[in-house]
């Protein structure tokens, strides 16, 4: 079975990148966010929800007024 030169080249590049990769170290940020997980997601969804409500309510009110005026 013959190995293609492209896959052989990519394999060599990956191996060399792993061997010569610098050591990394995780550092804590001073301004780490205290909220994480579902609390953070709920906060973002609340902000997005309020923006949507502020944009949609006036439009919905216009449609409701138009439909009520057409019925009369």
Swiss-Prot record:
Belongs to the formicidae venom precursor-01 superfamily. It comes from the Eukaryota. InterPro entries: Pilosulin. It is found in: Secreted. Keywords: Neurotoxin, Secreted, Signal, Toxin. One of its GO terms (cellular component) is extracellular region. Residues 1-26 form the signal peptide. GO terms for molecular function: toxin activity. This is U10-myrmicitoxin-Tb1a. Expressed by the venom gland. Residues 27-36 form a propeptide. Pfam families: Pilosulin. The keyword Secreted applies.
